A protein has these predicted regions:
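Short S/T/G/P-rich N-terminal loop/turn motif that feeds into the first structured element of a domain
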Residues: 1-37, 41-54, 88, 92-105
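Generic structural signal for short, flexible, solvent-exposed coil/loop and linker residues
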Residues: 36, 47-51, 57, 71-83
Length: 105
């Protein structure tokens, strides 16, 4: 299942402005690769960021949102950001379901 992780931090805790956050950020890719193996996380599909919005958007393929929560805590994401984990669906999958439902009527 796909989940969107929306992690928003303040300008004061931004890795561009805060040395402690910068340290966490620079180690993040390696930490994610190591820590995700502990949980039912299949893959980090994409990792985007909006510097001006102070937000990271991480698309994760996982079984449970609780595993993503643990990942965010273990990697330090939750120590500098407010984290929101949202289940996602692909557009193509939803339109297929809609067509199947329509065809049954």
């Amino acid at each position: 299942m796909l989940f969107g992780v929306f992690a928003t931090h303040s300008p004061e805790s931004c890795p561009m402005n805060n040395e402690s956050s910068k340290e966490t950020f620079l180690k993040l890719k390696n930490q994610l690769d190591v820590e995700m193996k502990k949980y039912n996380i299949n893959k980090i599909v994409e990792f985007y960021m909006s510097v001006l919005e102070h937000q990271w958007i991480i698309i994760i393929d996982a079984i449970h949102a609780h595993d993503i929560e643990k990942l965010c805590i273990d990697t330090g994401i939750a120590s500098t950001s407010i984290v929101k984990i949202v289940p996602l669906n692909r557009y193509e999958d939803i339109t297929k379901k809609m067509q199947l439902k329509k065809n049954k009527l």
